[in-house]
């Protein structure tokens, strides 16, 4: 799956988990919106979630994921695995084109429609067309500075916005 039009980044440092997403929505080669909100808090404010891909599909997945969080008592790991299983096996969900990046204070997961739940090795992860740029910048800042998680997300997202034509610098940031 190839997703244009977004960058979502999460960084964890010193007990802070911070997620940022750009605001650009692109249709083909046209920017339709510059201030979309692709990052939100779920699970009574204890879980961060961001999406790359179709907005309508992502809203469906946010709803399903939040239901899984409730079903599993806020257990992010179990909710992520159960959503991925449903996403892979459900006839309707299988057609949804999006990726989810979810995190709490302890865990970070990328959830795909292929039934994959990926937990990164580091305290950072990113999805979307600008994800590789944001992730590279975040890793460099994590390794070489004492910046807070929020400052790293802000700086890395700005760098991604300078490089990726499908990412703007109108950043929405949430933290737990």
Swiss-Prot record:
Signal peptide: none annotated. Pfam families: Proteasome. It is found in: Cytoplasm. GO terms for molecular function: metal ion binding; threonine-type endopeptidase activity. Allosterically activated by HslU binding. The keyword Iron-sulfur does not apply. The keyword Lipoprotein does not apply. Transmembrane segments: none annotated. Na(+) binds at residues 161, 164, 167. It catalyses: ATP-dependent cleavage of peptide bonds with broad specificity. Its main location: cytoplasm. Keywords: Allosteric enzyme, Cytoplasm, Hydrolase, Metal-binding, Protease, Sodium, Threonine protease. Its EC number is 3.4.25.2. GO terms for cellular component: HslUV protease complex; proteasome core complex. The active site is at residue 6. It comes from the Bacteria. One of its GO terms (biological process) is proteolysis involved in protein catabolic process. A double ring-shaped homohexamer of HslV is capped on each side by a ring-shaped HslU homohexamer. The assembly of the HslU/HslV complex is dependent on binding of ATP. Protease subunit of a proteasome-like degradation complex believed to be a general protein degrading machinery. NCBIfam families: ATP_dep_HslV, PRK05456.1. Belongs to the peptidase T1B family. HslV subfamily. This is ATP-dependent protease subunit HslV. It comes from Thermotoga petrophila (strain ATCC BAA-488 / DSM 13995 / JCM 10881 / RKU-1). The lineage of its organism: Bacteria, Thermotogati, Thermotogota, Thermotogae, Thermotogales. The gene is hslV.
């Amino acid at each position: 799956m190839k997703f244009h039009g977004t960058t979502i980044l999460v960084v964890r440092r010193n007990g802070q988990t911070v997620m940022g997403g750009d605001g650009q929505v692109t249709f083909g080669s046209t920017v339709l919106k510059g201030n979309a909100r692709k990052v939100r808090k779920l699970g009574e404010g204890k879980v961060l979630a961001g999406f790359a891909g179709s907005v309508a599909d992502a809203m469906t997945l946010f709803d399903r994921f939040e239901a899984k969080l409730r079903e599993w008592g806020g257990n992010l790991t179990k909710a992520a695995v159960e959503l991925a299983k449903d996403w892979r096996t459900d006839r309707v969900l299988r057609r949804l084109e999006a990726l989810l990046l979810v995190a709490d204070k302890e865990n970070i997961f990328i959830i795909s429609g292929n039934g994959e739940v990926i937990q990164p090795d580091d305290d950072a992860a990113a999805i979307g067309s600008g994800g590789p740029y944001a992730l590279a910048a975040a890793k460099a800042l994590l390794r070489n500075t004492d910046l807070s998680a929020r400052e790293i997300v802000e700086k890395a997202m700005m760098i991604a916005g300078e490089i990726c034509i499908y990412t703007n610098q109108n950043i929405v940031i949430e933290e737990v």
